[in-house]
Amino acid sequence: MVQKFMSRYQAALLGLGLLLVFLLYMGLPGPPEQTSRLWRGPNVTVLTGLTRGNSRIFYREVLPIQQACRAEVVFLHGKAFNSHTWEQLGTLQLLSERGYRAVAIDLPGFGNSAPSEEVSTEAGRVELLERVFQDLQVQNTVLVSPSLSGSYALPFLMQNHHQLRGFVPIAPTYTRNYAQEQFRAVKTPTLILYGELDHTLARESLQQLRHLPNHSMVKLRDAGHACYLHKPEAFHLALLAFLDHLP
């Protein structure tokens, strides 16, 4: 009788333990968001190469699968990243499948691009981007600029905004180097992207970027500074919506 009671007691404890394990499992966060969920098309060839000149810049490029190119998009990168980031995320391939030509470059000293004294000055950084665009025959482009690359993109925007079809800053640096009046003079269509959990650069850059007269803004929830890594699907949706509606 005692043994029968003990076996029932042990079975009850085992059942309770299994229930607790199940509840704990159900409460755990799900797997990371898939980075290629939006890209279901055929394989896309990612071309690579080096620009000409003294400061040779490594780049990755995809051409539109469709014959007609809807627009050209150039991707810069942040301090901890390089052009490969945009291939790993599937961003380049996705844009190719949607009819865009997309180019991602390694800034000097990152990835496969050698360091260059030229980019130690603002004028040198602008000249570098101008030369890259010319060498790759990029015209009327959309420039995507996260974080550190703001020190390249912002000076270029201020001097050559008439050459850009669109601008996508993602919590960029260098915004404090310009006055509100300078931002108001830029008419380029702009998509301001930032992560909800980025309480440093995003907040600082927004104070200035919001003065761009032709801008829209998207906050990616539960994402930090590198919001495109934390929420790639939401990032791709916002980017494509912006690109698809450019004049």
Curated annotation (Swiss-Prot):
The active site is at residues 147, 198, 225. Pfam families: Abhydrolase_6. Glycans are attached at residue 43. This is Protein ABHD14A. Gene3D superfamilies: alpha/beta hydrolase. One of its GO terms (molecular function) is hydrolase activity. Its EC number is 3.-.-.-. The chain crosses the membrane at residues 11-31. The gene is Abhd14a. Widely expressed. Higher expression is detected in brain, kidney, heart, testis, ovary and uterus. InterPro entries: AB_hydrolase_1, AB_hydrolase_fold. Keywords: Cytoplasm, Glycoprotein, Hydrolase, Membrane, Signal-anchor, Transmembrane, Transmembrane helix. SUPFAM superfamilies: alpha/beta-Hydrolases. GO terms for cellular component: cytoplasm; membrane. It is a single-pass type II membrane protein. It is an enzyme of class 3 (hydrolase).
